[in-house]
Amino acid sequence: MKTEQLMTFLISPEQTIVEAMQKIDANAKGILFITNTDRKLIGAITDGDIRRWLIKTGNLQEQISRLMNRNPKSVYRREVASAQDVMRRYSITALPVLNSKGIVIDILFEQEQKTEVREGSLSLDK
């Protein structure tokens, strides 16, 4: 994933619910990963988290740090081969890939993982 595309999935904890909604709308995947100024992963937020927050409080100006999941699932670069298993085990559709310093370097999506496996399987049949 190119850096420009990766940035559409990253947001800082100080940004508001409205800003998060705009980014989620733009990336069309229903999720954002919260990073600190060093781009280290510190949380995740989904469109469902935002919907539940709005039903509960109605506050669009709150910082996303108030409602983010502070323990998001992730894999390190060397563990990418296990990404599909992690997604299946935790019923998640997006999984950030971290380097050894905990910096987000890529995001894997469930549909893309299935496509890669399916295409790989087909090429073995030839």
PLM segments and residue spans:
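A glycine-centered beta-loop-beta connector
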Residues: 24-27, 32-49, 87, 95-112
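A short, polar/charged loop-to-alpha-helix boundary motif
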Residues: 49-64, 112-123
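Non-catalytic, surface-exposed connector residues within folded enzymatic/regulatory domains
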Residues: 44, 58-61, 77
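Bateman (tandem CBS) regulatory domains
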Residues: 1-9, 60-72
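A structure-centric signal for secondary-structure junctions around beta-strands
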Residues: 5, 28-29, 124
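N-terminal start-of-chain detector that recognizes signal peptides
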Residues: 2-6, 14, 38, 45-48, ...
